[in-house]
Amino acid sequence: MNQVIAEPMSTKNILFLTNTLRKKFNLYDCTYFPIVEFIETVLPEIDPKFSYLYVDKAEMPDTYAYFDNETKVMVIREDVYEGALNGSGRDRFTLAHELGHYVLHSSGVQLCRSDGGRVVTYCDPEWQANTFASKLLMPDHLIYTLTPSEISKEFGASYQAAEIALYKAKKAKLAT
């Protein structure tokens, strides 16, 4: 089975990147990251090669969104876009995940295929993009003292994503 492998990246490094991004755009202490506005407005300004495209669900019935790192085009299903605009935690996470692929895997980072064996977690581009999405939408420094319900409401995340983010943030804090 072919598997895609990315350059190694730890949770700590990904958190550093998401916090740096938030600081650069004066969003460090913002609880509700404006993911749609960031993709539609900020990315095209900072990278003229980046573009996005909304497609009908019938065109991509089994895919919510994807980022093509060769063309730098993010393709998003219209229902996912509308869900993100309306605050759906799952859809906001999907867009943040694709932003993660853009940030982590489009600027000279080589993805390669492997012919077997298990890919270690920190080299898995999907794990990296999920971690990026979680840390971008629910940064550790803002969620430590909250409950999953509070995180879900204040940060626009699903309850399940909030539970996982809080568990990992507390675990990381204990490790330091």
Language-model features and meaning:
Residues 1-176:
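Active-site hotspot residues in diverse enzymes, especially metal/ion-binding acidic/histidine motifs
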